[in-house]
């Protein structure tokens, strides 16, 4: 069979793809032929990196299928590229698939690949699976490094498994590995995600920030050459909340990692008093807030419905000749909608106008999130939701099904004629999205 497959080429190869590939059953041979990602190992490596960069992680298995059909023999390096792609896309089953394929070909996973697998477990909030990966490392005599322990600690922290987190800390101590800022960030995350949350959680968070000061200079997670090659920041590898901002040097001071995680946690807890205490600690350290810290402090005030202080922070930042960031506008808009008060919705409306005047535009994810929240307004004129819809429509941006559904239902709850142009457009968009995603009932 293998000989037969390899002997088929040219026009007939697209037919083989149609018969063999996992995802091509509904495609024509011509369409399938166009999906031939590459022809040799070097081109396939480029294709994998390109798919990952485009965040089309769901295509990685297709690329691999195509590679096998071309008879291209995978190497350890390209398997690493595949696993990094699944890590960035949080596709745990695909990550394990590539690991098993490696083993089947006699390629032994190394410590870096195991670190990527553990990180993927963390992204999928599966600490127990991360422990299984770590146990597999020990069975195969793969020596863990500092990154392994920090990946493992943060993977367990995301799912709030305090017992496992402290067991890892003990293992680190026994191995002579010091706790760095990412470890303390993980400890804060673990306590935040533990259910039920203790009453003194805010105090505990402040204690961890204080404790971290004596250890922040210890480097237990030196970046590997492989991390650099794949452009993986430590924040991304360890699933730190600032991962999406780690490459924005004017947005983020990377030496404030523990403060970033602490401010984010206190914002989740809506603890204004503890947030202000943490801000004083930061000032006593002789450091200033970066943009990420400002976002979390704003979020804490706004979600506590202290709109006055939240708005003041925003205005002070904008008048201080600092570089404006889109996230400042969207954080204020989202937070001001908390409780759907008249004052808050007016702030959200005014901020949307300012944002548009400053030529900041909503992207699909942010716009959908804001529309979803704005659509929850039960009273009032629905002005903010309508504005967000119009701003996205003006740039031909289609919101997610969840956002459109919420907006559609909100419009239907109001006394709007069935032939209203807005309602008709939203209804048509809603039905088209449901049809595309297979949730619209078949009317046969």
From Swiss-Prot:
Keywords: Mitochondrion, Repeat, Transit peptide. Residues 1-25 form a transit peptide. Its main location: mitochondrion. PPR repeats lie at residues 40-74, 75-109, 110-144, 145-179, 255-289, 290-325. GO terms for cellular component: mitochondrion. It is found in: Mitochondrion. GO terms for molecular function: mRNA binding. Belongs to the PPR family. P subfamily. This is Pentatricopeptide repeat-containing protein At4g35850, mitochondrial. It comes from Arabidopsis thaliana.
């Amino acid at each position: 069979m293998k000989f037969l497959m390899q002997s088929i080429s040219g026009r007939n190869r697209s037919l083989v793809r149609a018969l063999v590939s996992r995802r091509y059953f509904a495609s024509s041979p011509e369409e399938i032929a166009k999906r031939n990602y590459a022809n040799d190992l070097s081109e396939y490596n480029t294709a994998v990196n390109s798919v990952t960069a485009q965040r089309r992680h769901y295509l990685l298995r297709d690329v691999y299928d195509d590679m096998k059909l071309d008879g291209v023999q995978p190497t350890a390096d390209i398997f690493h590229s595949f696993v990094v792609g699944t890590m960035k896309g949080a596709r745990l089953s695909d990550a394990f698939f590539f690991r098993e394929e490696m083993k089947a070909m006699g390629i032994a996973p190394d410590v870096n690949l195991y670190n990527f697998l553990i990180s993927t477990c963390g992204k999928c909030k599966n600490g127990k699976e991360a422990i299984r990966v770590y146990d597999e490392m020990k069975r195969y005599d793969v020596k863990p490094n500092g990154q392994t322990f920090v990946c493992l600690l943060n993977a367990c922290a995301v799912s709030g498994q305090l017992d496992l987190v402290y067991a890892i800390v003990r293992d680190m101590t026994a191995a002579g590995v010091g706790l760095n800022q990412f470890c303390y960030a993980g400890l804060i995350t673990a306590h935040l995600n533990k259910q039920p949350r203790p009453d003194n959680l805010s105090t505990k968070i402040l204690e961890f920030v204080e404790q971290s000061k004596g250890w922040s200079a210890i480097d237990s997670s030196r970046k590997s050459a492989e991390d650099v090659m794949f452009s993986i920041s430590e924040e991304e590898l360890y699933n730190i909340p600032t991962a999406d901002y780690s490459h924005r040097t004017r947005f983020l001071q990377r030496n404030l990692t523990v403060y970033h995680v602490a401010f984010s946690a206190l914002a989740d807890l809506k603890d204004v008093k503890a947030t202000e205490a943490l801000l004083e600690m930061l000032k006593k350290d002789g450091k200033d807030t970066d943009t990420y810290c400002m976002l979390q402090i704003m979020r804490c005030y706004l979600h506590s419905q202290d709109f006055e202080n939240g708005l003041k922070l925003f205005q002070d930042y904008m008048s201080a000749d600092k570089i404006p960031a889109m996230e400042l506008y969207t954080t204020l808009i989202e937070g001001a909608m908390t409780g759907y008060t008249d004052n808050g919705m007016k702030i959200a409306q005014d901020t949307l106008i300012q944002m548009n005047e400053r030529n900041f535009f909503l992207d699909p994810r942010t716009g959908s999130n804001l529309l979803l929240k704005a659509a929850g307004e039960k009273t009032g004129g629905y002005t903010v939701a309508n504005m967000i819809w119009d701003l996205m429509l003006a740039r031909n941006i289609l919101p997610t099904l969840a956002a459109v559904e919420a907006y559609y239902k909100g419009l239907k709850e109001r006394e709007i004629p069935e032939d209203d142009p807005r309602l008709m457009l939203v209804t048509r968009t809603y039905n088209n999205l449901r049809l595309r995603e297979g949730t619209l009932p078949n009317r046969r």
